[in-house]
Amino acid sequence: MQTIARAYLAGQPFSSPQLLEHFLPPYHEGVISAWLKEYLPPGAWVLDPLGSTPFPALEAARSGYRVLVASNNPILTLLLEVLAAAPPERELQAVLAELASSRRLDERLEIHVQSLYQTECPACNARIQADGFIWDREQAKPVLKLIQCPVCGAQDEYPLSAADEERVTPPGRMELHRARAIERISSPDSPLHAGAVEAMQMYQPRALYIVSTIINRIEGLNLPESRRKLLWTLALTMLDAGTSLWGWPEERNRPRQLSIPPRFRESNLWMVLEQAVRNWPRSEKPVFITRWPNLPPEEGGICVFPGRLREWLPLPRGIQPLGAITVVPRPNQAFWTLSAVWAGWLWGREAVLPLKGTLERRRYDWQWHAGALHHTLSILRRNSAAEMPIFLICPELVPGFYSAVAAAASAAGYLQTGQALCADAETAQLVLQGGADVPSPASQVGENLARTGVEEVIKLRNEPTPYLLLHAAALAALARGGGIPFNKPEIAWDTLTKLQNLVGRVFNKSESLIRFGSQAQASESGWWWLAQESGQDEPPLADRVEMEIIRLLIRQGGTPRSEIETIVYDKYPGWLTPDTAWLDACLDSYAEADERGTWRLRQAEQPANRRQDLLQVGEQLAVLADKLGLVVQGENPWEWRLKDGTLIFRFYGLASSMLARYILAEEEEVEFQRVIILPGSRAKLATLKLHRDMRLQQMAAGWHFLKFRHLRTLAERANINMDLWNMLLDADPISGDPQQPRMLF
């Protein structure tokens, strides 16, 4: 089978926050449904063998497919079942109100918990609740409180008062609270005990007391199972926010290790519960969901198997998936360990057993990850038709992650029959299908395979290419040529090391590649180009994408962003997948979006208007040449010559940022000055292109860039002379940073 370059499916990010989203692998809506529509008929059985996130199954079921999900993590099972139920906000409000009114001794639970966050507003002395507290890890205590005063409007960080410091320690003996929390996870003589004790360090005393108290109250409520699940899910938001993992100042936290940052936020956990109700993900309609062996209807739904795939397969006759979909997560010791802890707190020690390995293991490397993924894929390979397609989404991609996926898939007997990789989105989308045995090449042959794969992709793109994409290209070439162990019962302990060394030699010891960009000496970074020019006639990929977007905007008029992405990614699939940042930059440069997100070409960018602009450029250059006593010749490029015929300036007029056709075509060392003249609206795009393509940047080192408006200003100056021209030529740079005028002669 041959790998087919597939169009990258961009999808759409969620419009609102999702539960546990900082732990779950990133997911865009629309990707799974688009893939299923192409590969499988509606109503078909589809399998998610990992169940790493609830969203693929939900999307597939809403698209009319029957989805089988193997879910070994009870926390993710709960999340999937509750999101499928799509409870309205009023139900969430009702169960939270019932929890709030439950009693702790002689007071309402809500009042008791809120009293632990009580503080005084430093601005007006009103007694209010703090939004949270900022802890210092070294001092092992809170040092600031976060206030949004509902009385006077004060909103800031403030030092703690003496009363605030007293409330840090909750009622009762903290040692007893902590011991009881650990006991719900494991017994003292259990091999899981040390991991449970270590995980407890993620909760400060007040947070641990509150989560324990609230979970006890949930257990004491007489609720039907559906409402109890709602409370458990709300409690998850509290358990999540209650850890010490959330650094301060706030940033894009995606913790993977149980490591407390130097400063972290302790949130007001009752406020967290209230916010969870307000921010609950809204969905159009519930999804039919059941647990095995009960099955969903033909019109679509989800069947969850709460266990490992090996305990489930083979499936009975009549229930044979026609395809598989899954999001491959990166190893996440923090989430996996906390899932075991939360499962124990919510449901007791039995619920911890499926995740017991997470309390025993502290670190996960890529070799471990490859082995775990190989185990799952091998089970799937033995229990499904060879031609059954598997769609893998691999977000947060790094070289080691891709190596693990490639090694696992090959060793399980799968070939890549489709691929797309978006480098700046750090996401690969792979289609796997079972294949016949591939012969293993000799080591030197394998190195040549990888090098050829890298060079072919660079030539295909015809521009310096980021390492991540080339690393994947090397491994894909190895997999096609038998350079990765294929159809093996297990992955050898040194497989990834050997692959890394082989690919490393391609980049470190190759005379055919040169590296741009990163200051680091490691090869796994920067942008790579060919030591010898590619000789390709195609423009650089960035120019091709820019031209496609221009044509699209001219041809179609108003176009939604999603449609633009689909057209561009269809045109440039596989290794040609453009960066999302470049698509954004092109749209911002040429077009504007209305309130509905429809993009239209700006009036100034209409072809007729830009042709007129370039005609005016020629006229303005002629006016300037006359004032400077020079002779103008040619038409785009225009040349300025001295009376004796000596060429001193050559000007290139552009309405786009497609610089390569001029800059790369010129000799590097010339005796005259070269100037690109372009619209001011193209300045940011041209600057970004020079930043991305350092080969182009190097070649452009002696060039000048002149905006239309600046040329017009210079042409209108009555007192212009050669010295003044030389001083002002670079006074309005495309980078937007004013420069000191410099002399050219």
What residue ranges belong to the model's regions?
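Short, contiguous acidic/charged loop-to-helix segments that flank catalytic cores in large enzymes
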Residues: 23, 348, 358-371, 394-400, ...
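Extended hydrophobic-aromatic, low-complexity segments
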Residues: 315, 323-326, 332-339, 391-393, ...
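Short, basic/hydrophobic alpha-helical segments
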Residues: 34-41, 374-385, 660-674
